[in-house]
Amino acid sequence: MNSMFNVFRQKTNPSKQYRSEMGIIADILCVAMDCGAQGAIISSISRRANLSHYAVLDKCKKLTDAGLIKSIKGNRNHIFIITEKGIRFFQEFQRFQILIQSVNLRY
């Protein structure tokens, strides 16, 4: 698993267990990045990003509408593949995350 995935999953406040929407989106994009050109099915994203099936569907719809991932419908499932725009967004988000952590802020 991508080492940056663990950075996104770290909790700055151990008593607070919830991720922001941006944290969830970053987790989904990280899974999509790890899967590369072959893409990821919903169950794989759900398992690796620790989200329900329906939460993954909702977020992937938003990411597809924004052009950050593309959806390919197979015989039995959807495959989600990160786009070039999604890769650029994810890289910029990683830089932002590092900056935020360096000044001890929680996004």
Task: Go through the PLM ranges and name each one.
Residues 45, 56-66:
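Basic amphipathic alpha-helical segments that dock to polyanions
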Residues 16-51, 55:
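N-terminal helix-turn-helix DNA-binding core of bacterial DNA-binding proteins
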Residues 64-74:
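A short, conserved structural fragment
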Residues 2-13, 91-107:
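Amphipathic alpha-helical dimerization/coiled-coil segments
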Residues 39-42, 72-76:
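Short, surface-exposed loop/turn segments at secondary-structure junctions
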Residues 75-91:
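Basic, amphipathic "hinge/linker" alpha-helix immediately C-terminal to the N-terminal HTH DNA-binding motif
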